[in-house]
Amino acid sequence: MKASVIIPNLNGAGWLRDSIESIWAQTEQDFELIVIDNGSTDESLEIARSYCGNPRYHLIENSENTGFSHAVNQGIAMAKGEYVALFNNDAFAEPNWLEELLKTAESDPKIFAVSSLMLRYYEPELADDAGDYVTILGFACKRGDGLKASRYQKPCRIFSACGGAALYRKSILDKIGVFDALPICF
C-alpha cells in the first residue's frame, strides 16, 4: 500500500464528512484512511462510524481527548502504507493532493517529509502554511502565513512540515520515532 492517510478528530461534525470525502476523491487511490476520534461529544463520531463498511477505512475511538500527537501516533502504529499523510479534520484536499505529495517524496529517497501549501478557507488566494521555518531566535513559524499563495508554488527545503496536511516517509518515522505526546506539543 502506498499511503496511510490519518485524520485526528475532536468534535469536527461541521466539516469531517467533507474532509473525508475529499480524501476518497483522490486521483491516487492506493491508500487506507484512518480516523482517530478523540472522545467527541458532537455528531462527528456517528459520521466517522458511517464509513466503517469500507475495507480501506479504519476507525479508532478514544473515550477521551488524548491530544493531537497521541492520536496521530495511534494511527501511525496501525498504518500499513509506505508513507503516512496527516490531514486535519477541517482541511479539504484538492483531488491530486496525495498524488502530488507522493510524487515529490519519491523524487528523492532522502526526503522525509513533504508539506502541503495550505490555503485560507475564506481567502484562498492567501497561504495559511507553506511549511515551517525557524527564526534566528529559535522560534518555529508558519512559512507564508497570510501572504499570496502564488509565491509558494515551487518546491523548496523547509525546516518542518505542518502536520495539518503533510506526508512523511514511514520507514524514517520507524527509525527516529513518532510525534512527542507531551501536552505542550501541538
Give names to the regions the model predicted.
Residues N62-A79, N89:
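Glycine-rich, basic loop-to-helix element that forms the pyrophosphate-binding segment
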Residues S22-D30:
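Short, acidic, metal-binding catalytic loop of nucleotide-sugar glycosyltransferases
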Residues F92-T135, F139:
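Conserved donor NDP-sugar-binding/catalytic core segment of glycosyltransferases
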Residues L126-A127, L147-S171, D180-F186:
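A recurrent flexible, glycine/aromatic-enriched loop bordering the glycosyltransferase active site
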Residues V84:
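Short aromatic/hydrophobic "clamp" motif used to bind/position activated sugar donors
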Residues K2-S4, E32:
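Cell-envelope/extracellular polymer assembly enzymes that use nucleotide-activated donors
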Residues S22, D37-E46, E64:
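A conserved acidic beta->alpha catalytic loop
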Residues S116, T135-I158:
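Short, flexible, basic/aromatic active-site loop/helix in glycosyltransferases
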